[in-house]
Amino acid sequence: MEELIAKRYLKAIKQGSNAESMREIALIFSILSEAFNDKKFIQIINNPDVSRDQKSEILLAAVKSAGYKEVENLIKLLAEHNRIEIIPAIAEVMRKDIAKTNRVYSGVVYSDSVVDSKVMEDLGNGLGSRFNSKISLKFVKDNFNGIKVDVEDLGVEISFSKARINTQMIEHIIKAI
């Protein structure tokens, strides 16, 4: 639900912004969304004793130095309609939209053994050429017996399981005999 509402706000922001200002606004919202990881901040935002104007002033003080009237007006609008809690969703929708526009994505490689950086680069380049985009991959050590590549924004997940490959090889050998 939050994502649908965030997309509406994104559409409005995109109409009045160019690509460079979109990146800067996305950065501002990304930083604001990090504040929602702080329990004390969430207590203040969810506290019914704190007025909408006070919540708005707290957020406006955080973004005042950026000097974007659009951001300030959006924060006032969000506070007015009690939608401050969707700021992280707006930040995520903006990040995905910018990635889609620039065709630059990030993904994760999961494996139980260390994957060489050259292999990671080759995987990223191969996937990037397949999807006509630039994909950067980072490694996460996991208990997955094989290699799994996940590029969430593209909706791509590729996995190579050692057990499955062994099973397929055995089946192929049995068929050959």
UniProtKB/Swiss-Prot annotation:
GO terms for molecular function: proton-transporting ATP synthase activity, rotational mechanism. The keyword Acetylation does not apply. Keywords: ATP synthesis, Cell inner membrane, Cell membrane, CF(1), Hydrogen ion transport, Ion transport, Membrane, Transport. Its main location: membrane. GO terms for cellular component: plasma membrane; proton-transporting ATP synthase complex. It is found in: Cell inner membrane. InterPro entries: ATP_synth_OSCP/delta_N_sf, ATPase_OSCP/dsu. It is a peripheral membrane protein. It holds the Pfam family OSCP. F-type ATPases have 2 components, F(1) - the catalytic core - and F(0) - the membrane proton channel. F(1) has five subunits: alpha(3), beta(3), gamma(1), delta(1), epsilon(1). F(0) has three main subunits: a(1), b(2) and c(10-14). The alpha and beta chains form an alternating ring which encloses part of the gamma chain. F(1) is attached to F(0) by a central stalk formed by the gamma and epsilon chains, while a peripheral stalk is formed by the delta and b chains. F(1)F(0) ATP synthase produces ATP from ADP in the presence of a proton or sodium gradient. F-type ATPases consist of two structural domains, F(1) containing the extramembraneous catalytic core and F(0) containing the membrane proton channel, linked together by a central stalk and a peripheral stalk. During catalysis, ATP synthesis in the catalytic domain of F(1) is coupled via a rotary mechanism of the central stalk subunits to proton translocation. Belongs to the ATPase delta chain family. This is ATP synthase subunit delta. It comes from Sulfurimonas denitrificans (strain ATCC 33889 / DSM 1251) (Thiomicrospira denitrificans (strain ATCC 33889 / DSM 1251)).
